[in-house]
């Protein structure tokens, strides 16, 4: 009986504790409000990240953290790798406005896919009518202002290779019908109207697609056979996989703006119209 009473008392105590336990979470933006830290370029590491010695870490905001603290350890690791990261911090251009990754027919995806079409045509010597990439392959936005190499590398981190695929018009139409029904991806060279989940209109070069005509498609190897549930190479008349990665195509293109004295800028247009959603 005594043992039973002890067990009952213990269970009651646990019940009381479980009822009174409370946890709260506070969300802070990663804005450097504790330390004044900002993202460094290759030539401003002390100003952006602060300085460190054997005894303490002094942040850009003036706060001092002793050796052995968690902040000291994090700062030491971040500062130590900066020489290796210096090439990625190289300023390669200037963007006149922010370009957000907002799916198909946003300025950023249009900028990438339209250039990809040009580069695939240049590399393969084939006529390219349509371009196609997946939205998920674009990982971050392009900020306004100075653009560093890491902005592009972080945006396009995957080892996706440029490809050329020749498709008959009926297969190209089927590809866009599937995307309209599931999830439209980023494209160029076409005008698409979606009504609900149904492809209403597909124009290439301003004309309706001819089922028997062969069209050139610029894409990436990830989408050839099932990536993001897309099979661009299904029923391909011709397939060329290049040895050029998307990032290796886009970096020189981004740098070319500064070389000719221009700012990086692009636009959304009317290539995609969605009705009934």
Give the residues covered by each predicted segment.
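Bacterial N-terminal signal peptides that target proteins for export
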Residues: 1-8
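Hydrophobic helical h-region of N-terminal Sec-dependent signal peptides
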Residues: 10-13
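C-terminal motif of bacterial Sec signal peptides marking the signal peptidase cleavage site
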Residues: 16-18
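Feature captures C-terminal
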Residues: 22-62, 106, 110-121, 126-277
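Non-membrane alpha-helical secondary structure
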Residues: 66-70, 77-80, 108, 242, ...
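N-terminal, Lys/Arg- and Ser/Thr-rich interaction peptides
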Residues: 68-95
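Acidic/histidine-rich, surface-exposed loop or edge segments in extracytoplasmic proteins
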Residues: 85-103, 229-234
């Amino acid at each position: 009986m005594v043992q039973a009473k002890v067990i009952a008392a213990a269970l009651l105590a646990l019940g009381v504790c479980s009822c009174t336990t409370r946890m709260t979470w506070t969300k802070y933006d990663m804005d450097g409000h504790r330390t004044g830290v900002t993202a460094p370029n290759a030539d401003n590491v002390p100003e952006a990240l602060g300085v460190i010695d054997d005894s303490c870490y002094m942040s850009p905001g003036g706060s001092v953290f002793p050796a052995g603290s968690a902040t000291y350890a994090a700062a030491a690791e971040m500062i130590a790798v900066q020489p290796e990261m210096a090439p990625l911090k190289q300023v390669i251009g200037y963007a006149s406005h922010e370009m957000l990754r907002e799916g198909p027919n946003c300025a950023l995806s249009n900028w990438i896919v339209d250039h990809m079409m040009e580069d695939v045509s240049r590399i393969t010597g084939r006529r390219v009518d349509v371009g196609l990439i997946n939205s998920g392959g674009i990982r971050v936005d392009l900020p306004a202002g100075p653009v560093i190499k890491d902005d592009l590398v972080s945006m396009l981190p995957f080892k996706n290779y440029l490809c050329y695929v020749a498709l008959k018009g009926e297969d190209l139409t089927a590809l866009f019908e599937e995307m309209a029904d599931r999830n439209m991806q980023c494209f160029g060279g076409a005008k698409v109207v979606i009504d609900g989940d149904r492809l209403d209109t597909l124009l290439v070069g301003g004309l309706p697609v001819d089922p028997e005509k062969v069209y050139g498609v610029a894409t990436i190897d990830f989408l050839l056979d099932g990536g993001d549930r897309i099979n661009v190479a299904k029923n391909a008349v011709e397939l060329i996989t290049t040895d050029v990665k998307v990032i290796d195509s886009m970096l020189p293109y981004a740098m070319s703006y500064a070389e000719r004295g221009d700012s990086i800028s692009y636009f959304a247009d009317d290539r995609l119209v969605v009705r009934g959603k």
